[in-house]
Amino acid sequence: IKNGVSDNTIYNVCYGSDGFIWLSTDKGISRYDGFRFRDYPLIMGIDSLSTPLHQAVKKLCEGPDGLYYALLFQGGITCFDKDIEKFLPVRFDKPLELKDILDFCWNDGSLYLVTSQGLFESRIVRKTEGKHDFVLCLLNPEPVVRGKVAHLCSDGKTNLYFSVNQRKVVHYDLVAKKTSLIKEYSVVNRLFLRHGYLWICRLWDDIICYDLKT
């Protein structure tokens, strides 16, 4: 593509409600408007040679508040406000290391966070202190599910799907507050939920399509 993304590695693609295509890259995020790309580098600091040190973005998702939530490869989460074209830090109302955030997904206005301690539900509030704008995460102190959770996805209604210990594919009913085992495999690498089908990617093995409607 002429005038494409400048030498970046693309990890994830997100189609926003604004009609733009948003890309998570090894240097931050990029926006494609149908004609050209615009890069928004996420800089974590400057090295001894005054070279910017970028944060790689693993996953990008638009929230119900219109902000874009970015999962970082080094662990953690940050937000991007497309209107002011600025990254916003995320803070928590309870003790939690930002780097402990391993995955996330939105469901019915709640932000579900995967941490090293398990799966947590949270609510998001945008705050301003002086000249500093940030996003405050109000965390439920009790985990929804304990254990080594990963690869979180949601149907946007009452169901969450994720892996536990990289082997078990699990369904969680948000209404009944119960978990059920879908299937256990040797190694679960990724999960994707599309149109009632759960796609289960396994390491060095076939991809499984699981029909959730049956």
Regions found by a protein language model. Give the residues of each.
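Carboxylate-rich, polar loop motifs that coordinate divalent cations or form catalytic acidic clusters
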Residues: I1-T214
